Amino acid sequence: MERRIEDVQYCERLFQSFYDIGSTSQGGVTRLGYSETEDTMHEVFKGLGRELGASVITDEVGNTYVTNTDEDGYTLIGSHLDSVIEGGRYDGVAGVMAGLMVMRWAKEDGIRIPLRVGAFRCEESSNFGCCTIGSGLITHEVYKQDIGHLMSKDGESLESIFEHRGLTLHPKKISGLRRYLELHIEQGKVLRECKTQVGIVGTIAGPVRYRVYLRCLLYTSD
């Protein structure tokens, strides 16, 4: 029971570390990809990792990893720290917190497991109209075409943002991981209907975005 209480307290502290960042007057959070707000989320994540005695790695597209190893064959537990506009506080953050908790357990129990906790940049499409940018670029599976022309809500191109930050749109492919695990909040009603708290996802619906232009003619009667 004592260990369980400590785990809950640590989980609450992790959550509070991120809680106010990007808060809005409507009660949600706005943490757009490759914004200063998302930067702050990643800096907090780095600090929490260093508290565990872990090393911090930032890759060529700005993704952040907290790691206890420099060896190949590691387990990667990851998610994202950005959000949609007026998003929820658990989306993405819960998966990163879960990884930090696993790393803490391994350290406290003396379990030697090569582990990395990852936070991928710009998972949501709210800023550029295009999702999974950080993870998509490093896997070489999502973006076969150039995406540097994408424009942020502030009117700045992704290419310009990357250049300013010293990042590249053509990074090396991620390597060395043995398995990947992501805990995520449910964004549906399956668990509730099944009256269970946890499920294992078998398939994922791929996101598709459309931009629609409507040309209208206005007719009025006298």
Where are these regions (language model features)?
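Catalytic-core environment of secreted peptidases
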Residues: 48, 52, 60, 64-91, ...
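N-terminal capping segment at the start of a domain
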Residues: 2-35, 121
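General structural feature for long, well-ordered alpha-helical segments within catalytic domains
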Residues: 7-14, 37, 41-48, 102, ...
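Short beta-strand elements
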Residues: 199-216
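A non-catalytic alpha/beta surface segment that caps or lines the substrate-entry region
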Residues: 23-69
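Acidic/histidine-rich catalytic neighborhood of metal-dependent amide-processing enzymes
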Residues: 84, 94-198
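Alpha-helix capping and helix-loop boundary segments enriched in small/acidic/polar residues
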Residues: 2, 6, 87-90, 126
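Conserved small/polar residues in nucleotide/adenosyl-binding loops
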Residues: 219-222
